[in-house]
């Protein structure tokens, strides 16, 4: 990699000669100033990190230094699995580098059919539709299901892709307080009974790593005659007896109308999907704009996904290692005095809560300098006034790496003044 290519894109100091009232980018002046203030403090830009080399699911080279990865969503560590890599290479040789078309035209290859069958087998459903990204899966299915005159009822802390799907579909949007069964019941009860309704939930919420009380929420939704969609992006592979997600872990098989997921986390590649047992589910392909009007995934990508999904069906040891690592990290950080996003280890996400952006940036920088990469998160990705470092644990982290990580957090926390 050349030195120039390794540098993140810089914002120009001087704006083009356009009158401010006609400059479409002037709305971002506050954001630009805030970013510059952060960089002027001497902190590396936390939102422009370059992986110069990736050595394994848990190690990379960043800024010329060997770094433990604790912020990649690579929960099951499938990115370097030999069988997964071999499947991608074979498809690349057999079908070429891309499809040059949408799924509705020439963009469905043998491996697209194979990955959708793998999803049906994994989830035990009759239907599966693959999208080019997880974001597009939510954007596509929500905007297609719920339109004008219909209602989408969603958690206030829902992912941006869920909100964008609501807006694209032009449905009425009703928000309820995060993880509040009572507020969900109240909001649904106030709506007219006649229009169709879709309740959108997430198994694991990606910022704090907390899980939804799906059992109670699904019961409320069904009481009010609403259909239910659950996004299991951050739980696929290691929640429930078959790794299907939080809904399976809470005994809700057969009660969820649509399950959304992604390939970019536990599966270890890129893409998104929706699975369902609804008898009319295939009609989504004929009406879903984000499915129809975009190029399909390259054959090598869906081939790797197929192999990974089938291996995840029996990845019992990996699941146990992931949960063991998550409990060790959560428990260790809590014992040191860090304030965490959840009281108990609820998922493979551990959020370290901090006072403000300055403290979060200093802590993040201290960890990076010590050889550890985590995600720094701030509004609007987090709730207003919430600043945190998000740790995503991997099944391939060794016990020794987890202990090293705990030592890094202790040293950085003391240096910054987060812990005593």
Swiss-Prot record:
Enzyme type, top EC level: transferase
Pfam family, one: Aminotran_1_2
Keyword Lipid metabolism attributed: yes
One Gene Ontology term of the molecular function aspect: acyltransferase activity
Keyword flag Lipid metabolism: yes
Activity regulation remarks: Not inhibited by relatively high concentrations of palmitoyl-CoA. Inhibited by both D-cycloserine (DCS) and L-cycloserine (LCS), which inactivate SPT by transamination to form a free pyridoxamine 5'-phosphate (PMP) and beta-aminooxyacetaldehyde that remain bound at the active site. Inhibition is reversed by incubation with excess pyridoxal phosphate. Inhibited by the fungal natural product myriocin, which acts as a competitive inhibitor for both L-serine and palmitoyl-CoA substrates.
Main location: cytoplasm
Organism domain of life: Bacteria
Localisation per UniProt entry: Cytoplasm
Annotated function: Catalyzes the condensation of L-serine with palmitoyl-CoA (hexadecanoyl-CoA) to produce 3-oxosphinganine. Exhibits a broad substrate specificity concerning the chain length and the degree of unsaturation of acyl-CoA.
The protein's assembly and partners: Homodimer.
Similarity comment: Belongs to the class-II pyridoxal-phosphate-dependent aminotransferase family.
Name of the protein in its database record: Serine palmitoyltransferase
Organism for this UniProt entry: Sphingomonas paucimobilis (Pseudomonas paucimobilis)
């Amino acid at each position: 990699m050349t030195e120039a290519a390794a540098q993140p894109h810089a914002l120009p100091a001087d704006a083009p000669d356009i009158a401010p009232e006609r400059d479409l980018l002037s709305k971002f002046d506050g954001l630009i100033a805030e970013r510059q203030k952060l960089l002027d403090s001497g902190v590396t830009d936390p939102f422009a990190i370059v992986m110069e080399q990736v050595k394994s699911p848990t190690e990379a080279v960043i800024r010329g230094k060997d770094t433990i990865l604790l912020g990649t969503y690579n929960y099951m560590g499938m990115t370097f699995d030999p069988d997964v890599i071999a499947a991608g290479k074979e498809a690349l040789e057999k079908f070429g580098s891309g499809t040059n078309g949408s799924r509705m035209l020439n963009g469905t290859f043998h491996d697209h059919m194979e990955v959708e069958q793998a999803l049906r087998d994994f989830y035990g459903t009759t239907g599966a539709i693959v999208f080019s990204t997880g974001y597009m899966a939510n954007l596509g299915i929500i905007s297609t299901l719920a339109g004008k005159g219909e209602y989408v009822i969603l958690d206030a802390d829902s992912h941006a892709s869920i909100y964008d799907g609501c807006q694209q579909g032009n449905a009425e949007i009703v928000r309820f307080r995060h993880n509040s069964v009572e507020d969900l019941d109240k909001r649904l009860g106030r709506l007219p009974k006649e229009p169709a309704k879709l309740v959108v939930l997430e198994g694991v919420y990606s910022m704090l790593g907390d899980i939804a009380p799906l059992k109670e929420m699904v019961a409320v939704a069904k009481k009010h005659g609403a259909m239910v969609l659950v996004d299991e992006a951050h739980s696929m592979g290691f929640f429930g007896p078959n790794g299907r997600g939080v809904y399976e872990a809470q005994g809700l098989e057969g009660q969820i109308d649509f399950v959304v997921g992604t390939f970019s986390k536990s599966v270890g590649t890129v893409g998104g999907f929706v699975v369902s047992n609804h008898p009319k589910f295939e009609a989504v392909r004929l009406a879903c704009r984000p499915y129809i009007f975009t190029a399909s995934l390259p054959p090598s990508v869906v081939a790797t996904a197929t192999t990974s999904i089938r291996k995840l069906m029996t990845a019992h040891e990996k699941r146990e290692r992931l949960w063991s690592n998550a409990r060790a990290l959560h428990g260790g950080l809590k014992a040191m005095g860090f304030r965490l996003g959840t009281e108990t280890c609820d998922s493979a996400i551990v959020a370290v809560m901090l006072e403000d952006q300055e403290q979060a940036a200093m802590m993040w920088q201290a960890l990076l300098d010590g050889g550890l990469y985590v995600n720094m998160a701030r509004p609007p990705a987090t709730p207003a006034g919430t600043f945190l470092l998000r740790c995503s644990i991997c099944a391939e982290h060794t016990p020794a790496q987890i202990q090293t990580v705990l030592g890094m957090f202790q040293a950085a926390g003391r240096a910054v003044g987060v812990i005593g």
